[in-house]
Amino acid sequence: CLCNSDGPSVRGNTLSGILWLAGCPSGWHNCKKHKPTIGWCCK
């Protein structure tokens, strides 16, 4: 999950992701749709 928010740097990209089972909470976006009901959510 590559994001612009603060997080550990991996190959020059910041990572900040949380796996949600029912989409993403308000203020977050789903950066990778693994399955219809699973969201890899980033701020």
Curated annotation (Swiss-Prot):
Pfam families assigned: Toxin_4
GO molecular function: sodium channel regulator activity; toxin activity
Keywords, comma-separated and alphabetical: Disulfide bond, Ion channel impairing toxin, Nematocyst, Neurotoxin, Secreted, Toxin, Voltage-gated sodium channel impairing toxin
Keyword Secreted: yes
Superkingdom of the source species: Eukaryota
GO-annotated cellular components: extracellular region; nematocyst
Primary location: secreted
GO BP terms in the entry: regulation of signal transduction
Protein role: Binds specifically to voltage-gated sodium channels (Nav), thereby delaying their inactivation during signal transduction. Thus it strongly stimulates mammalian cardiac muscle contraction.
Family note: Belongs to the sea anemone sodium channel inhibitory toxin family. Type I subfamily.
Protein name in UniProt: Delta-actitoxin-Bca1a
Annotated source species: Bunodosoma capense (Knobbly sea anemone)
Lineage: Eukaryota, Metazoa, Cnidaria, Anthozoa, Hexacorallia
